[in-house]
Curated annotation (Swiss-Prot):
GO biological process per UniProt: translation
Oligomer status and interactors: Part of the 50S ribosomal subunit; part of the 5S rRNA/L5/L18/L25 subcomplex. Contacts the 5S rRNA. Binds to the 5S rRNA independently of L5 and L18.
Job of this protein: This is one of the proteins that binds to the 5S RNA in the ribosome where it forms part of the central protuberance.
Lineage: Bacteria, Bacillati, Cyanobacteriota, Cyanophyceae, Nostocales
Protein name: Large ribosomal subunit protein bL25
Entry's Gene Ontology cellular component terms: cytosolic large ribosomal subunit
Record keywords: Ribonucleoprotein, Ribosomal protein, RNA-binding, rRNA-binding
The gene coding this protein: rplY
Organism: Nostoc punctiforme (strain ATCC 29133 / PCC 73102)
Length: 199
């Protein structure tokens, strides 16, 4: 999924607080021409729509700086939220064109109902729900699906068990635990009943 965002260069000497009062959110684009950065402004309404569809370090964005002029692919690297108002405060983008593989965070989606949960009353324990991977910008997956249907109580899946799309490489240790099925949880009342029965 690629999303197009229109932006403008930030006027020199402009104050971030004044920009926000006028309905503009300050932003920066890094990685443009190597280490050069560009100060930007984006309309608050555009940012609001963007954040409904984009995750930090995940979604490829077509960023258009109308008065630069510059247009290219970028990732939203950082999002600052106002501590009191809970509204977007500042955005940082990273230009990915010409940088080869990039590092992104990808959500994990667990599909199916584990046998150990459905038939044996076990509990599905998801240890991680996001994973850092390396891939080319055009290969960034929106989500990585993991089928847990065949997991029984005591079974687990590690990163090495995940079928990654071609060109996507996990950056965490392959032995790292992702999901497992735990035995049914016994309540205090049930435990007391079992103790009385045993005695």
């Amino acid at each position: 999924m690629t999303i197009t965002v229109e932006s403008l260069k930030r006027p020199e000497g402009s104050k971030p607080r004044a920009l926000r009062r006028s309905g503009l959110i300050p932003a920066n684009l890094y990685g443009h021409k190597g280490t050069e950065s560009i100060s930007l402004t984006i309309e608050a309404k555009t940012v609001e729509r963007l954040l409904k569809r984009v995750s930090v370090n995940n979604t490829l964005i077509e960023l258009n700086i109308a008065d630069a002029p510059w247009r290219g692919k970028a990732l939203l690297r950082e999002l600052q939220i106002h501590p009191a108002k809970g509204t977007p405060y500042h955005l940082s983008f990273f230009a990915v064109a010409g940088h080869g593989d990039t590092t992104v965070e990808v959500r994990l989606r667990f599909v199916g109902t584990a046998v150990g949960v459905k038939q044996e009353g076990g509990v599905l324990d998801t240890v991680i729900t996001e994973l850092q991977v390396s891939c080319a910008p055009e290969n960034i997956p929106d989500v990585i699906e993991i089928d847990v249907t065949n997991l029984q109580i005591g079974d687990s899946l590690s990163i090495s068990d995940i079928p990654f799309p071609e060109g996507v490489t996990p950056l965490a240790e392959l032995e790292r635990l992702v999901v497992s099925v735990l035995p049914p949880q016994i309540s205090a009342d049930d435990a007391g009943t079992e103790t009385e029965t045993a005695s």
